[in-house]
């Protein structure tokens, strides 16, 4: 490929602390009425002083450890100065000169195999407020309202090196990061609620000439799919400009989900535009060896480690292990099921197909469903005893998922118990053979697929309740014996 994208991400992770970064207002403000979770500190009233939230610092250290970062025992807060209606202080408290962590990495499944994406820095900062545009977008709004609830909500910003080589890799990185912060319990990682936000910097290299385009920042990507789509669009836009012998502006662009395009927002700021200087009202953050050791002990088993254990302990293929461990709750559900039904591969197959289908259709997590390990114990018992076929099991599963009823109850209510009566099945096969001598002749002439006709006949006559294995066996016996 002649043109190659060079992508780096700036990701904001909203921390699930009880209170805000520097005051005692609640941090979970997503569903609160506008301007009801504010105080003199987070709205920047004169004389109000910030007090750092210890839980925020602990969450940042946990995340940095999980991302293989170098933790700095000494870090400091700074003021990032800029004017915007949702920033009442006129500055944002961040960490610029001395971040809490640097030099990390995260391994992802890249386009050409396993790949390390380096992390330049991880630092703490507070969130700004939120503008609510009348008309849904800033370009089409007749006026905008300011909601200060989000002011002061704690964030960590994670900045990667430009190691990402495709829009797909950017999406995979984001998905992996969300999985990690959820495992750690430091964030919900819900992009649609703004708990995980991504800005991407993209430039394009012409591999034949070595020429590189200007860097463009892309914002407003509030889903993993939009991260990938926005970067695909921007890559194509830059390539077209380069093919015309032009260069793109160094600017910030926003993803418009309606038109599926990026639109110019403003010129790209330089870091000097923010006039960073040390925050005088907050002392430095000094971490002891004992504190770091204590936090390290709190780290849970992370997705990669859990996937390796699933492969080793349950003899699962790598693909199964990765799918099951992509969500902490799903992995826990699988292990609970294995305790009740010790058939890991069968359970894995059911969870990855039937369960995930139902979850995705409803856009819910496994913890929000009525499904329990006991449902699988009952379902597998029905199949093992020959009372239902796998076809019937899959047929009733949506009702099991929806209602929480036991499979055996549904089977009884709907009269779906499998027919294992050999005599009855034999009579039906004979009836089919009498009515369809041509199919019998075809079978004897070597067209073995003709046997399927007789199996289908029995299934239709019994409304799918005949034991398929037994039916197949009887069909073969009678046809061979003719």
UniProtKB/Swiss-Prot annotation:
Domain of life where this protein originates: Bacteria
Catalyzed reactions: L-glutamyl-tRNA(Gln) + L-glutamine + ATP + H2O = L-glutaminyl-tRNA(Gln) + L-glutamate + ADP + phosphate + H(+); L-aspartyl-tRNA(Asn) + L-glutamine + ATP + H2O = L-asparaginyl-tRNA(Asn) + L-glutamate + ADP + phosphate + 2 H(+)
Single GO biological process annotation from the record: glutaminyl-tRNAGln biosynthesis via transamidation
EC number, UniProt record: 6.3.5.-
Keyword field: ATP-binding, Ligase, Nucleotide-binding, Protein biosynthesis
PROSITE patterns on file: GATB
InterPro entries assigned: Asn/Gln-tRNA_amidoTrfase_suB/E (IPR017959), Asn/Gln-tRNA_Trfase_suB/E_cat (IPR006075), Asn/Gln_amidotransferase (IPR018027), Asn/Gln_tRNA_amidoTrase-B-like (IPR003789), GatB (IPR004413), GatB_C_1 (IPR042114), GatB_Yqey_C_2 (IPR023168), Gln-tRNA_amidoTrfase_suB_CS (IPR017958)
Keyword set includes Ligase: yes
MF term (GO), any: asparaginyl-tRNA synthase (glutamine-hydrolyzing) activity
KW Transcription (keyword) present: no
Family note: Belongs to the GatB/GatE family. GatB subfamily.
Subunit structure, as described in the record: Heterotrimer of A, B and C subunits.
Biological role stated in the UniProt entry: Allows the formation of correctly charged Asn-tRNA(Asn) or Gln-tRNA(Gln) through the transamidation of misacylated Asp-tRNA(Asn) or Glu-tRNA(Gln) in organisms which lack either or both of asparaginyl-tRNA or glutaminyl-tRNA synthetases. The reaction takes place in the presence of glutamine and ATP through an activated phospho-Asp-tRNA(Asn) or phospho-Glu-tRNA(Gln).
Protein name, per record: Aspartyl/glutamyl-tRNA(Asn/Gln) amidotransferase subunit B
Classification lineage: Bacteria, Thermotogati, Thermotogota, Thermotogae, Thermotogales
